Amino acid sequence: MKAKKKLGVGLSRQERQVLVIGEIIQELLKAHEAKKDVNLNRMKSLVASKYGLDSSPRLVDIIAAVPQDAKKILLPKLRAKPIRTASGIAVVAVMCKPHRCPHINMTGNICVYCPGGPDSDFEYSTQSYTGYEPTSMRAIRSRYDPFLQTRHRVEQLKQLGHSVDKVEFIVMGGTFMCLPEEYRDYFIRNLHDALSGHSSANVAEAVRYSEKSRTKCIGITIETRPDYCLKRHISDMLSYGCTRLEIGVQSVYEDVARDTNRGHTVRAVCESFQLGKDAGYKIVTHMMPDLPNVDFERDIEQFIEYFENPAFRSDGLKIYPTLVIRGTGLYELWKTGRYKSYPPSMLVDLVAKILALVPPWTRVYRVQRDIPMPLVSSGVEHGNLRELALARMKDLGTTCRDVRTREVGIQEIHNKVRPYEIELIRRDYVANGGWETFLSYEDPEQDILVGLLRLRKCSPDTFRPELKGECSIVRELHVYGSVVPVNARDPTKFQHQGFGMLLMEEAERIAREEHGSTKLAVISGVGTRNYYRKMGYQLDGPYMSKSIEENN
């Protein structure tokens, strides 16, 4: 039997690569016209071997070669990791420079489980990171320069086929608010400048130009600790355009916080939650099951307490099961047999039980750290812990009803389902000294979430002058689904179909008629202020606000 003749004989590797990419694009267009599903990896391998190439072309090279008139058709099929923008936003994680943890001065040491930092085995890494996480490696390559980190990541997402019309920053790398004010201003200024292309003299100028930028900064998330989430820190973060706080809690038990050397009390956690929510922030926390002195039952009890006690009840959660990493105090306890991690199956059971407890207004952002497995001596043994936990829940007949699982974009990617009958659903609850209302547009039959709004009646304890008196605040407005550019309207996508406007109208009605408020404020990302201006809101300090008295 004759061997199949290879095409492109006599051509250079680069020339054959061009032919391969051209043929892949043609095949994808044919499949689209025939309304057929295609296994892209298999197609790439077959076409590459046909031309005698030992490896398939990179996705970024294929995306770059797609003709302009075919981009709308092919980019959704070629997009790498579509989950990255399924929520409607491109997340850009950046890291500040390595610095020591601030509570070393008080307690003499860092938390027992914490890797990284200038004094650790991973000395060029930031506190609580090893330097081998994808975000850490990008930051190290850019020498922790915020401008370069942003530009490189935005460019990378574009090359992978994602729309970066809306960007949300996550400032990682330990407690950002303990760094000198001058450095913080430089860092935030450069994040905004990287999107707008303007070279600003200060944060206020950077924010002003960022408002008009083509790539919108729709929010900034800052990682902090309860003791660096006081009034002055909250006000500084508002001036940066920050809309969400990630607060390290780890445990709701006072004895565990003490024994792991957290350097703050559980009471400080509750106070920081109330201060943050009364200033309009979304609150996301980091929680660590499997810490020393906590068994399986006690872990379950702490999450029941966390979700049911109004002193906690955050808007979002990152579940980070404890990892034993070389160079930490916990590593020494583990080596001498004084600490033992849960077996893998028990950890999957625990996470499944935690996910079953999550209320429908809370979003679980992550279920494990991004630390490479070879650096982990003991702890999580699976890289797909969330998927295993969700599979275990299916076996047990329970479901996870958190925001992320129900998002329309995630449902389209994972389950290929789209909402059929959408209706407005309202949930009220008490949290952190205030009345919270969670409004959402959902398909209740399929349990799919299209958009949400978090409304809070400001408590009398709020310290921000803009929110004093009879005032309510919208802490979050988000319509889910793949990113749609701010001025575009795609009838197959859920963003920009008017759901946001309808949610705001209902929030105004509740604030006026039920809260008895005369003013409604919104904590808005810098790039979305014009959206609220169209609805009659005006800049009021760091907020957008509007009078909602009856005669208006």
UniProtKB/Swiss-Prot annotation:
Residues 84-374 form the Radical SAM core domain. Its EC number is 2.3.1.311. Disruption phenotype: Pronounced larval developmental delay and death at the pupal stage with delayed and reduced ecdysone-induced transcription, developmental of melanotic nodules and up-regulation of stress-induced genes. RNAi-mediated knockdown results in lethality at larval third instar or the late pupal stage. RNAi-mediated knockdown in sensory organ precursor cells abolishes central spindle asymmetry during asymmetric cell division. InterPro entries: Acyl_CoA_acyltransferase, ELP3, ELP3-like, ELP3-like_N, Elp3/MiaA/NifB-like_rSAM, GNAT_dom, Radical_SAM_C, rSAM. One of its GO terms (molecular function) is metal ion binding. One of its GO terms (biological process) is tRNA wobble base 5-methoxycarbonylmethyl-2-thiouridinylation. One of its GO terms (cellular component) is synapse. Changing Y531F: Embryonic lethality. Able to rescue the loss of spindle asymmetry phenotype. Acetyl-CoA binds at K166, E476, L477, H478, V479, F499, G500, M501, Y532. [4Fe-4S] cluster binds at C101, C111, C114. Its cofactor is [4Fe-4S] cluster. Keywords: 4Fe-4S, Acyltransferase, Cytoplasm, Cytoskeleton, Iron, Iron-sulfur, Metal-binding, Microtubule, Nucleus, RNA-binding, S-adenosyl-L-methionine, Transferase, tRNA processing, tRNA-binding. Pfam families: ELP3_N, Radical_SAM, Radical_SAM_C. Binds 1 [4Fe-4S] cluster. The cluster is coordinated with 3 cysteines and an exchangeable S-adenosyl-L-methionine. Residues 398-552 form the N-acetyltransferase domain. Its main location: cytoplasm. It is found in: Cytoplasm; Nucleus; Cytoplasm, Cytoskeleton, Spindle. It is an enzyme of class 2 (transferase). It catalyses: uridine(34) in tRNA + acetyl-CoA + S-adenosyl-L-methionine + H2O = 5-(carboxymethyl)uridine(34) in tRNA + 5'-deoxyadenosine + L-methionine + CoA + 2 H(+). Pathway: tRNA modification; 5-methoxycarbonylmethyl-2-thiouridine-tRNA biosynthesis. Component of the elongator complex composed of Elp1, Elp2, Elp3, Elp4, Elp5 and Elp6. The elongator complex associates with and stabilizes microtubules; efficient interaction requires the full complex. Catalytic tRNA acetyltransferase subunit of the elongator complex, which is required for multiple tRNA modifications, including mcm5U (5-methoxycarbonylmethyl uridine), mcm5s2U (5-methoxycarbonylmethyl-2-thiouridine), and ncm5U (5-carbamoylmethyl uridine). In the elongator complex, acts as a tRNA uridine(34) acetyltransferase by mediating formation of carboxymethyluridine in the wobble base at position 34 in tRNAs. Binding by the elongator complex stabilizes microtubules and promotes their growth. Belongs to the ELP3 family. This is Elongator complex protein 3.
